[in-house]
Amino acid sequence: MALLELKNINKFFGKVQAVNGVNFEVKQSEVLALLGDNGAGKSTLAKIISGVYAPSSGEIYFDGELMTKWDVQSARSKGIETVYQDRALAEQQSIASNIFIGRELSGSMSMGFINLKKQYEEADNLMREIGLTSQAFNAKTPLLTLSGGELQGIAIARAFYFKARLVILDEPVTSLSLNESEKVYNFIDKVKREGLSCILICHNIYQAYDTADRFVVLDRGRNVLNVEKKDLSAQQLIDSMREIAHSAHT
């Protein structure tokens, strides 16, 4: 059974149709690469999946259940987290505030203190595992002191920290060095083996091919290709995307 399934998803902004009859599914422990030119509808579709936008029509299934209500709260309750290109961080706040944002500690004050200390330790370990911060983790460290790569690390850590079932990564390594990017993709491979699913939006087709198990290509809001990695080579994927881009301009 698919973890997430989209059936005939459409999204209009006024008279403009940004997503047109999209169908695909994401399986457990699968990385799906969502590819396409700028304006193809990738980010809009990601925001539909994460609950930021409601689809104009179509059906969303999670664990085989039809989601009759779909918003950010519904998506998060199902274990869907997102890392956007702009990171959506509160840069006036601390590292801890951003990683734990939107979550409440449970229990008494004494138990809360213990939980908070444990969360700091777990978040520290996660940041070190991803390898994106050069600073020792400190709950009070303000984001204003961090580099672009470190900020991206915080955004990624926040998504993975709460043991999400599906993480949407929208251009997750745009501001990172090659070394930092490699660490992120290695981490994605690790959590996939542990059962987590990912939707990866990126422009680097070779990196997408190395990381993903399945590829969905969008063109003007439509999914025009849906194929597993075992069924084509990286060069065949590139050639297919070139043909799609050429047909879009003829």
Residue ranges and their predicted role:
Residues 2-250:
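Glycine-rich phosphate-binding loops of nucleotide-dependent enzymes
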